[in-house]
Amino acid sequence: MSKNAASALADFLEQRAKAVRAIEAEAEAIIHGQGDQAGYVAKMREKAALLSALATDARPLVLALEPRLSETADERLERFSQSAATSLKVGSPFFMSALLYPDEHQPGQPNDLELYVAEVRSWG
């Protein structure tokens, strides 16, 4: 594996994690600032759609990793994507809002995708 392959994947995932945080911030502003439930739900759907495409979008970068890491990354990203796809099928804004956050998550802590970015960076 090239160090660049892990770095490229980590960079991509970091960009996606930042996009998710931005969507979440917009959703919070919409619901708390405007009381717009429909707008909030639309933002949660946007978040879930972005995450549901994660495994597919990252695939070329994952394939550049050495086989063991590629398999590990593929499985992990597929779990993120499957959870998001399920949340879209269920249609629950609560489920969508909880994506990437374990039950014990505290505000200010990194979410699961941000933690995974750090793990992928450690591969390089």
Name each model feature, range by range.
Residues A8, A58-L61, S87:
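Compositionally biased non-globular segments, especially hydrophobic aliphatic-rich helices
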Residues L50-R79:
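Short, solvent-exposed, charged loop/turn and helix-capping segments
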Residues Q37-A49, D74-Q82, E114:
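Short, charged, amphipathic alpha-helical segments
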Residues M1-A42:
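Short terminal alpha-helical segments
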Residues E78-G124:
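Amphipathic alpha-helical binding modules
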Residues A17, R21, H32-Q34, E66-S70, ...:
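Short, flexible coil/linker elements and helix-boundary hinge sites characteristic
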Residues A10-A17, R45-A48, S52-A55, S81, ...:
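Generic structural concept
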